[in-house]
Amino acid sequence: MMQKRNIRALTKEELRTFFESNGDKAFRGNQVYEWLWQKGVHTFEAMTSLPKATREMLAEHFSINHIKVDVMQRSNDGTIKNAVRLHDGLLVESVLIPTDTRTTACVSSQVGCSLNCSFCATARLKRMRNLLPDEIFDQVKVIDEQSRAFFGRPLSNIVFMGMGEPLMNYNNVLKAIDKITSPEGLGMSPKRITLSTSGIPKLIKKMADDEVKFKLAVSLHSAIGSVRTGIMPFNEQFPLEELRDALAYWYQKTKNRITYEYVVWKGINDQKKDVEALIKFCKFAPSKVNLIEYNPIDDGDFQQADPKALELYQTMLEAAGITVTVRHSRGKDIDAACGQLANKKVKSEE
């Protein structure tokens, strides 16, 4: 029996070529592409503008892979966490984060993660595989629908801060963003999309060379090499000096401000010297620092810093002319906060 190919892996041109090679008109490819990405149908039978014979031919050759929300949880603060079942049975998680003025989708790019950051629940999961472009797109599509249903407004922002390191799935993430921003997809502005990376220098430079239009955030957490290596072991492979050079290249090419994600922990990075190192690291380009409240994970050894440590960071950063925000996490009661994804449900199925 012929293995059916996921039709959503084909470009519009490949669809047009398929129809031509099967004795049909190329414009059928345009129609199918619209059904798949704008209208989001799950079956060929639903493509009602196509002749029945064409729909049957498609069903013979292709499948339409779609994600399924296995479990949806709602937090006391309105945050929604989705346990998402992929076509091969694997699970990832995505989150809808509401505020008074906007709704943000936090989406995953990999099943698990291979970077082993010691403070992150996802790092405890073995990386199984990269997500496909349609699987990333579908997470956003589902959360847009949830935003409209629960909050009466379309999705306003997307952050790649879920499970996985987006730059280790570079091509698929960029293909997904292309679909998300295309008028033939969701039509979202790339300026409303932020890709958060732990910092892979050569791929940050590649993004700059590829002239991407979305925003960049770096999961930094310490600007002292030995401290960062202790909490993010891959820093030994991609040291801060190389990361800084890559970010300088990014800014030179894009002129876009760089955002740093930064959790402050008790006894790890809560001293004045830590703030001074961060200021020195940031000064080469316009920067914004998001100070993030730590969210404990099961059996974790990390502790929240004293509020005075956050005040010290905020005061010193602002005095140095660096924009700073203190981000209080949402969805903690359902393990949907930063660093908590995959803390319970996915691990239980390993």
What do these predicted regions represent?
Residues 1-91, 98, 248-257, 264-350:
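Auxiliary Fe-S-binding modules of radical SAM enzymes
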Residues 98-144:
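Canonical Radical SAM [4Fe-4S] cluster-binding loop centered on the CxxxCxxC motif
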Residues 12, 114, 200-202, 224-225, ...:
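Alpha-helix N-cap/helix-start and coil->helix boundary motif
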Residues 80, 92, 103-107, 115, ...:
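Generic beta-strand structural signal
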